[in-house]
């Protein structure tokens, strides 16, 4: 769960910074990144109250480490009662059967999609590398957990190897 936090956290930051809307972020991560669900779609499925509680618990468990801090956006969603599919409203709106209502069209600018993927992957890879460095699990176990446990399209450390550590460090340095 700790390694997966940036999937939500960095996506929310991209939204809060005004770089892209939620539909575009979800679209980029699904179509370019190969993820089965976008982060906002997934938070709505899990329940924004549940996701916020898990995020807060991880933050508290790591002694309020800033990188795990819950966002104000998450908090406001919970306070508003916009918990996702179960309430018919979350980051997206849903009909009475829990199906997504018609939403806006995502931006299809390829450079924006790549920018989103690079940021989210860099943060995910950084978290996986930190877990590896601290001896939490082996490289193989981390990648197995992310592909089989969280259903990511690739293991994060295998993904990191495709472009190399220097590439991902460069992405992190400009964030």
Range-by-range predicted roles:
Residues 1-175:
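N-terminal glycine-rich phosphate-binding loop for ADP-containing cofactors
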């Amino acid at each position: 769960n700790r390694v997966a936090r940036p999937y939500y956290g960095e996506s929310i930051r991209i939204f809060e910074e005004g770089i892209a809307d939620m539909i575009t972020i979800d679209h980029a991560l699904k179509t370019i990144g190969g993820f089965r669900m976008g982060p906002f779609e997934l938070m709505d499925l899990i329940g924004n109250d549940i996701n916020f509680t898990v995020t807060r618990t991880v933050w508290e468990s790591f002694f309020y480490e800033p990188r795990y801090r819950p966002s104000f956006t998450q908090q406001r969603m919970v306070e508003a009662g916009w918990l996702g599919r179960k309430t018919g409203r979350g980051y997206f709106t849903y009909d009475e059967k829990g199906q997504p209502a018609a939403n806006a069209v995502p931006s299809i600018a390829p450079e924006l999609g790549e920018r989103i993927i690079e940021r989210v992957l860099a943060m995910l890879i950084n978290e996986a590398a930190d877990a590896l460095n601290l001896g939490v699990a082996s490289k193989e176990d981390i990648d197995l957990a992310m592909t089989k446990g969280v259903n990511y399209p690739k293991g994060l450390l295998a993904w990191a190897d495709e472009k190399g550590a220097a590439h991902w460090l460069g992405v992190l340095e400009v964030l």
